[in-house]
């Protein structure tokens, strides 16, 4: 058969012998799902939460063409704190998002001392601080309050992995939806604010 417009003959593809594909999120990364959720919250007037930019210092740029600049060398200016921050009903929100392919735990090496210190400072100012944890192999997402993350971090000095059992005991599972995709404000309202808002 000839395919228009390139007139290439089609060839039958051999089926792949690899593992079956998981189309649960249709290729959307966890970060993109959070960003889409935040866009939904903003469009509905529910919250203003944005991803924090990572400050970088550009060192070298190549210009292969006048209109196509390419950054070839850059460095982080400073250690970043958490991924997202904003406001929900007058409450300051600050959170980190982590995704793992592991089935039973999340490595604590994914959390850096400056992030833990930042979370402690947010909690000291009465902010709402937490981490969203996504286990991609099981398609499970949890909101773990920063207090419980910090407690575990200090127990093992950030060396081990946090077991899924601990996360299930102290965190709150978030079932993925359509709009919003990761409805974490529901957990904040029901569990962290006791069902009330200002």
Swiss-Prot record:
GO terms for molecular function: endonuclease activity; magnesium ion binding; nucleic acid binding. Residues 11-21 have a biased composition (Polar residues). It is found in: Cytoplasm. It catalyses: Endonucleolytic cleavage at a junction such as a reciprocal single-stranded crossover between two homologous DNA duplexes (Holliday junction). Binds 1 Mg(2+) ion per subunit. Pfam families: RecU. The record marks 98 as: Transition state stabilizer. InterPro entries: Resolv_RecU, Restrct_endonuc-II-like, tRNA_endonuc-like_dom_sf. SUPFAM superfamilies: Restriction endonuclease-like. Keywords: Cytoplasm, DNA damage, DNA recombination, DNA repair, Endonuclease, Hydrolase, Magnesium, Metal-binding, Nuclease. It comes from the Bacteria. Its cofactor is Mg(2+). Endonuclease that resolves Holliday junction intermediates in genetic recombination. Cleaves mobile four-strand junctions by introducing symmetrical nicks in paired strands. Promotes annealing of linear ssDNA with homologous dsDNA. Required for DNA repair, homologous recombination and chromosome segregation. Belongs to the RecU family. This is Holliday junction resolvase RecU. It comes from Streptococcus pneumoniae (strain CGSP14).
